[in-house]
Amino acid sequence: MKVLWAALVVALLAGCWADVEPESPLQGKPEPELEPELEPKRELEQEVEAEAGWQAGQPWELALARFWDYLRWVQTLSDQVQEDMLSNQVTQELTTLMEETMKEIKAYRAELEEQLGPMASETQARVAKELQAAQARLRSDMEDVRTRLTQYRGEVQAMLGQSTEELRARFASHMRKLRKRVLRDAEDLQKRLAVYRAGVREGAERSVSSIRERLWPLLEQARTRHANLATQPLRERVDALGQQLRGRLEEVGSRARSHLDEVREQMEEVQAKMEEQANQMRQQVEAFQARLKSWFEPLVEDMQRQWAGLVEKVQVAVGTSPTTPPLETK
């Protein structure tokens, strides 16, 4: 009887994982390229959408929202106040918010691992490894955002004697690398989750096939023995035992199905939250790029005016007619 119960439970496990894995929305869809004149407008729209679409429910999501809110507050300050704060206060505040976010993520991961307690130890280890990798990538991205506020201003000051075209090129390249890294992390996480779920489904199918091969001869023997029973009282007792066994199997199967459905829903919820988090981070980085462009635009224009004035003075000094300074390519 124990063997029959095990066969039914494994069969239910295979049925629960038989759903087809949907294709990831971030896979196979290249990011559309925008015209140069439409890119600032598009980035501004993405920034507004990111702020409106951010819905924080879990404690770690609230902590991450406070991190981005503090960045937006710093960007609204005047240039002089920012220069005074960037050296110490802003870095310390961002470090505190980042550590708070990591602490909440760790607590949420511990809660998830506790919910997956009835699962096999190998499955628990794989889930913990995936979440730990995602947490490490998020920490790296937040540390990079924290250091950009102090590094980029120094780079701009060091490039005052260079052309504005080189300044714009370095700025655009820097932001593209940051955006690509966030997209790469999101796609990598999706691939790892897809491989994990496929492995679990394949293992369940192999287990069901193996148990069927082992139990089929026993079932055939039981049928033969039941058919050869000679007396009616013995048949009645066997029928009663069979009904009792079916009732117990149905009860065990119902409990197993309920638990497996709950575990599958929890895994799908975790995957959906991680995908949503990665998409929101990508939108917020693009919005941050638009803000930095608008921040340093006055500095570039001032450099152009100074250059034009210097050329005009030199031309007047040598007695030549003023010429139009070269225009910056956009």
From Swiss-Prot:
Localization, UniProt: Secreted; Secreted, Extracellular space; Secreted, Extracellular space, Extracellular matrix; Extracellular vesicle
Region ranges (Lipid-binding and lipoprotein association): 226-303
7 X 22 AA approximate tandem repeats, as annotated region: 96-268
Residues the record lists as Methionine sulfoxide modifications: 159
Region (LDL and other lipoprotein receptors binding): 174-184
Single GO BP term: cholesterol efflux
Region (Disordered) location: 21-43
Similarity annotation: Belongs to the apolipoprotein A1/A4/E family.
Database matches in PANTHER family: APOLIPOPROTEIN (PTHR18976), APOLIPOPROTEIN E (PTHR18976:SF2)
Assembly behavior: Homotetramer. May interact with ABCA1; functionally associated with ABCA1 in the biogenesis of HDLs. May interact with APP/A4 amyloid-beta peptide; the interaction is extremely stable in vitro but its physiological significance is unclear. May interact with MAPT. May interact with MAP2. In the cerebrospinal fluid, interacts with secreted SORL1. Interacts with PMEL; this allows the loading of PMEL luminal fragment on ILVs to induce fibril nucleation.
Protein's name according to its UniProt entry: Apolipoprotein E
Source organism: Neomonachus schauinslandi
Taxon lineage: Eukaryota, Metazoa, Chordata, Craniata, Vertebrata
Gene name of the record: APOE
